[in-house]
Amino acid sequence: MMKKITERQSPLKLLEKKRAKAPEQPTPPIQEEPEPVSNVLQGDDILALAIKKEDLRKQHVPQFEETGEKPVVTQKFIIRKLKPKDSSKRVYHLVAHPATPDAATKPLDYSGPHDSFLSSGQILPHQILGSLQDFKRIAVARGNTQLAKLIHIQPCLMTLISAKEEPKPKPPKEEERPSPWAPPPQHNFLKNWRRHIALRKKQQEALSKHLKKPASELLMHTGESYRKIQEEREVIDRALPTQHDGKATSWFWSPLEYLGDEMTGLLMTKKKTQRGLVEPITHIRKPLSIQVETGLPAQKDAWYRYTWDRSLFLIYRRKELQSIMAELDFSQQDIDGLEVVGHGKPFSSVTVEEHLPPEKIQKSSSEDTVFLDSLTNLSDMVPMPILGPSLLFCGKPACWVRGSNPEDKKNIGIGVRLTFETLEGERTSSELTVVNNGTVAIWYNWRRRPHQDFFQDLKQNKTQRFYFNNREGVILPGETKHFTFFFKSLNAGIFRESWEFGTHPTLLGGAVLQVTLHAISLTQDIFMDERKLLETKLAAHEAITIAQSVLQDLLRGISTPERTPSPVDAYLTEEDLFNYRNPRLHYQHQVVQNLHQLWQQYRKAKATQKETPSLRTPVPLLLVEKASGSISPRNLVSEYSQLSPHQEMDTARKTRDFFLSLKSSIGKKSVARKSIMEELLVEEGPDRETTQRPWALKSISPPKWNLCLEDFRQAVMTFPEELQREDALIQLNKAAMELCQEQKPLQSDLLYQMCLQLWRDVIDSLVSQSLWLRNLLGLPEKETVYLDLPDEQGQKSPPVTESKVTSGKAGKEDRRGGAQEKKQLGTKDKDDKRGSKTPGKEDRPNSKKLKPKDDKKVVKSASRDRLLSEDPPPDSTAPSQEPIDPLVMEKYTQRLHAEVYALLDNLVTDVMVLADELSSTKNVEESLRFCS
């Protein structure tokens, strides 16, 4: 009862128990000023530092060893031992055995291994014929999408989408693509470089030791300054024209040069240097590190060598052109210090700056750590931790300072700068180390500091690019924290962030521990090779285009004289001239040559006459040349230049009178027919001037006779002797008669001739087959009557001949003449045989099918029918005296019919083959005629 009362009377103890059972919640630390700690140890403190045995037992628990012996238990095991494999290689031989006749043969397959591309998951270019683009296009067109998916086509040059944006299934063990910054696969090039440099140094040392000369004076190093001398010469050459008038050294005043003649040659343009477009001087030097590595740190020429750069004239020129050379070229000290240093991995660095002066930190901590300074001076003492809160922030101390100044909170105590440099899409990292070297646990947190952004309006999205663990935490005494910062950006640019490392208790009197993150993301140039190739092609195309335009401009400026056209009548033959002068006659070479000889004969006979030149003599020549239309006024002047003025007037008057009489004679109709030539010329006379073609025959020299029969006749009519004139007219009329007849073509219709010959062969073979059958079957032979038909080739009627020359009307007359001839033949047959059909009626429809050119055959057929009708064969009148078996005759008829069908079939086949061959040859000839 007493215990219960006491429990009721003590509620505070119950509350304390409940609070003890509840989980302790962390309370934020309250910023309080630390109480002054005395440095003098009290008695209780000394006793607390004493080491007790109980504490040692807790740290190290003793382990007692067992002294008793354990019984030994033995067991037996059976182990299977395998025989060693035979190390010798087995040789396999293939033996071919004859297959059984029942074995099924498989078709040969030349497609090669089918799984050649399934292992890699795509078709390679060397596995197919042609390009992958065409193969994929054909597969898609045929609907084979499964095969089209196996074809992977590289992006073309103009594709702007990078390969990284396309999601592609990567194989599990595929190696990552090396970075463009990585060194080439020749990973031993640095080793080779060092090995060659070591050999070079050994060679230098051996030569200098053997020759007793320094390494810089060796002959192998004399060419090191050659590039520098050449550059200095170029600078002096460019500076000289500015010092003087420049006419002697400048090409501005020089005239343009000709390659060849000034009229037909080419004008050479000036170069870029002559026009003042000088390219900048290219400086090539060795960096100091390379000079040290090659063993030439201080190269100096020997004092006894009088080189180009030691000449007095050069020294004078340098002083004279010093100001101009300084403007043209920059200082050589700038290029000597240039050096390219790089590596193949993304770059990251850590830079630390301490902004607070160290005097202030030492003054604030000197009062509390006086005894520690004396201890640190002793080398044999172990460094002791700093009492109180303290951090090593990236190696820089950040201690707790007694008292705080509000102005220090605005300043930066320690600034750490983390720099990242990588390609877009690549990740790089850097570490920040913080060590708690004090005796107090320090609570920390990260706060982002705002910074002024001048391009805030241009930024569209705020994407996180820096990644690290920015949660708050506690650093215990002696603990080291590593903060890893990562940077990754999908686009190129320069990015920056600032963070503040806050601590509790506050260090450095409230000064900021700032971490600046600065990153540069570079663009990956994946199309560099393609771009260079495209630039090369465009440059070549541009050069070709410029050259073509320049050539076209040059060709437009060059004017060549036009080629003199050939005269229209340059290729006229004698036959063309004859047909033009005599349109109603037909040219025959032999007859025309005879007329030429006749003309020459009478001309010589006329020239041999020793008569005084009369006024009448030049009239025929004038008429001949005037009628021909080929004489020019210049020839007329030369023809009559020898005549006197009085004779010229008489000649002109008589010529005019002769033309008037000629026109009047042409207008009248002559009743008596003297010759065919005169009738043709009279009909042609009125239209002679109208039908004359406009082209004149100037280029061809006029012949002695102008090939005009009218002019020939007029010249003959002027002969004084009547016998000579009559003889010439007779020969002229005879020639005209021959020229009126059209010459037969040398080659007639080949198809007609071949068909006729084939038909004759068929008839001959039919007759021979009939005779053979009659002889075989024992039938009597038929009596054959042979008629000797006279050759009627020369018997041609004038209407038939006229039908070849004339057109429409002549054709109608020909038809009428043919009808009259048939009518006459029919009346003759009616008189001989009244009751039978006349052969004229039978031949009337066949005569229409015949060609108009084959007049010979028309006459022959008519005469043959007439003879057959007059003398019928004896077979048609008298029957056979011997009796013939009807069965044998029927068999003979059937065999003969079968033979006729076979012969006709062969005839049709041969005709079709020959017709096709002739049509092909005609087409070839027509094409050749068109080409010519």
From Swiss-Prot:
The modification Phosphoserine is found at S559, S566. The modification Phosphothreonine is found at T560. GO terms for biological process: cell differentiation; chemical synaptic transmission; spermatogenesis. Residues 795-806 have a biased composition (Polar residues). The keyword Membrane applies. Coiled coil: none annotated. Keywords: Cytoplasm, Developmental protein, Differentiation, Membrane, Phosphoprotein, Spermatogenesis. It comes from the Eukaryota. May play a role in spermatogenesis. May be involved in synaptic processes. Interacts with MYCBP. PANTHER family: MYCBP-ASSOCIATED PROTEIN. This is MYCBP-associated protein. It comes from Mus musculus (Mouse). The gene is Mycbpap.
